[in-house]
């Protein structure tokens, strides 16, 4: 996988996700920079290559439908009626809403490529997907209100599936794997991680910040369990 620019959160995400998945196998990640382009390559034994490639494609697809989609919506939606934190929450919710569908489509567009030049894929192989994002953005009025945000996030939480676990502010999926999707759209945030997970129930251990508690009380009041 390669990307224009210096090593960044996208490179780190793919490297950590794939490397972590195969940490018990002879799989080595190497990051290199050449002419203002950064690449991450994975070396493994031939028998494991199909599995490493599949996981790499999955991670690259997540970068495209998280990092790139968030920036895409951010450019289209100024949302002056919302505070900065409310706007970020709405953008996160919009990214989360079709995450699985977007990811599956993106994986089909990666199929057959020898190298994932991630910015090239975004600009030239995701036209249909980007057109759907433009349509979605057109449904969001410039005067989108905090009340509308509340209703939208409430709807997403009611449609969620599965569980997410919080140990303090660290989020884990049902297999207790750390979740770091929110790091692709800004600073790591437990509330954003909850939204991006698409979970229906939240199980909390340890102590959460007031920000996270307020988020849970507002949007997941009947779906949160403190253990």
Specify the residue positions occupied by each region the protein language model found:
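C-terminal structured domains
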Residues: 174-227
């Amino acid at each position: 996988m390669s990307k224009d620019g210096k090593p960044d959160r996208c490179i780190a995400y793919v490297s950590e996700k794939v490397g972590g998945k195969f940490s018990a196998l002879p799989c080595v990640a190497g990051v290199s920079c050449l002419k203002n382009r950064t690449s991450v390559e994975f070396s493994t034994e031939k028998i494991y290559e199909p599995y490493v490639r599949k996981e790499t494609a999955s991670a690259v697809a997540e970068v495209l439908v998280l990092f790139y989609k968030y920036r895409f919506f951010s450019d289209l939606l100024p949302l002056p009626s919302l505070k900065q934190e409310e706007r970020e929450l709405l953008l996160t919710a919009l990214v989360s809403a079709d995450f699985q569908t977007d990811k599956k489509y993106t994986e089909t567009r990666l199929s057959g490529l020898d190298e994932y030049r991630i910015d090239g894929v975004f600009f030239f192989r995701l036209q249909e997907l980007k057109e759907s994002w433009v349509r979605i953005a057109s449904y969001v009025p410039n005067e989108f209100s905090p009340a509308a945000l509340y209703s939208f996030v409430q709807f997403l939480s009611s449609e969620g599936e599965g569980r997410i676990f919080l140990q303090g502010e660290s989020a884990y999926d049902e297999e207790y794997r750390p979740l770091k999707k929110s790091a692709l759209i800004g600073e790591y945030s437990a509330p954003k991680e909850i939204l991006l997970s698409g979970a229906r129930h939240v199980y909390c251990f340890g102590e959460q910040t007031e920000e996270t508690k307020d988020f849970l009380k507002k949007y997941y009041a009947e779906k949160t369990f403190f253990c």
